From Swiss-Prot:
Domain Protein kinase: 194-461
Function: Functions as a link between plant defense pathways, stress responses and potassium homeostasis. Promotes osmotic stress sensitivity, responses to the bacterial-derived pathogen-associated molecular pattern (PAMP) flg22, and resistance to bacterial pathogens. Promotes the accumulation of POT5/HAK5, a potassium transporter that mediates high-affinity uptake during potassium deficiency.
Active site: 319
Residue sites binding ATP per the record: 200-208, 222
Family: Belongs to the protein kinase superfamily. Ser/Thr protein kinase family.
Mod. after translation: Autophosphorylated at Ser-17 and Ser-26.
Primary location recorded for the protein, binned into one broad class: membrane
Record bears the keyword Membrane: yes
Entry's Gene Ontology molecular function annotations: ATP binding; protein kinase activity; protein serine kinase activity; protein serine/threonine kinase activity; protein serine/threonine/tyrosine kinase activity
GO BP terms, alphabetized: innate immune response; protein autophosphorylation; response to osmotic stress
Protein name in the entry: Integrin-linked protein kinase 1
Amino acid sequence: MENITAQLKRGISRQFSTGSIRRTLSRQFTRQSSLDPRRTNMRFSFGRQSSLDPIRRSPDSSKSDDEPHMSVPENLDSTMQLLFMASKGDVRGIEELLDEGIDVNSIDLDGRTALHIAACEGHLGVVKALLSRRANIDARDRWGSTAAADAKYYGNLDVYNLLKARGAKVPKTRKTPMTVSNPREVPEYELNPLEVQVRKSDGISKGAYQVAKWNGTRVSVKILDKDSYSDPERINAFRHELTLLEKVRHPNVIQFVGAVTQNIPMMIVVEYNPKGDLSVYLQKKGRLSPSKALRFALDIARGMNYLHECKPDPIIHCDLKPKNILLDRGGQLKISGFGMIRLSKISQDKAKVANHKAHIDLSNYYIAPEVYKDEIFDLRVDAHSFGVILYEITEGVPVFHPRPPEEVARMMCLEGKRPVFKTKSRSYPPDIKELIEKCWHPEAGIRPTFSEIIIRLDKIVANCSKQGWWKDTFKFPWK
């Protein structure tokens, strides 16, 4: 008896890889099961598993006809008792439970109903009894499998034919370009696509993230459009972005939630930041106070320094701009959009844009001259972008405003021009201007690394606090 209970509970150990997310006090994401009034907090792992379960048993697993009768363990809740009886073919026991008021469509942690279990095991009598009690014939488990699909997979043709005659649907299994050959190789980040709800009215924005819900939690989702499945370049770009997002963890970098790679549509899911991006924020606020400007600058620098220090290969953003910098609920900045531009590695610290014409927008005046001109570059291209952003934060207007972006990009990248500083020098520490000029210098070798930028920004903060400048406005919330 204890062995049966242990098998039933063993599946709970896999719970960590699925479910909704919650933020802990340490600002890290952990996984928890979605809440469903009919869902038990256990996973039914006794007997045959879903036909789409990555670690299911083999369809030709033999069931011993000499297996002794087993009674229901006393410490199981009503849902698990129902599923257990379905697995053992106990029609009378099931009817007694249903007469007591148990929901015939009760599900376990994997979304499996008694009908799923009975179909897997081939218990025709149980299936008939459940259908007579109006069991949902097309209920799908967390992998998208139905009772009919399970019956077909395990070769229970009598059950399958009955379900088909009652109008059951068998979901089509469509392979994705990232489908693994061995079910045990399914990534831990894999999400159940049925738990991700994207509003149809929003449509699908090609290549862009959109707001969705995952188990009731707001998230941002990028959905791979249908035309991309036959395009190796787009699949590789999707895979590259996913690989980078999966390995980064930093307070100033967008948080990866999970992805759907074994089902269509394929999608990447990241945290949702309700306050939008820095571009919209600057349009509303204009020039920021010195304290907020420095705090934002440090947020960006710390996130970028983390990306540049990633091992074994640093992550060059190559598209750092306000639209790719998000604000979380607390007003902290997070870097996003990295991995969108594919790079060809020239050496350990040198790279080149893989397909310049396809990936580089020549109206993007945040990019460094060497990127604009399709030259070989290193990590310092991101320092140039940081300098332009820091200028806009302190000045409150885009560079060379109101000239069109295409003209501004040519002026900065081809003509080597830089905008003048219009804000009064006493409004900001003089070291800020010097740092901006170093960052956007035409010569990449003169630009500082982000570790050096952080040191300089910390010194500016310390000097301002020490000298008591801007007492009314220069207050640091982190001190």
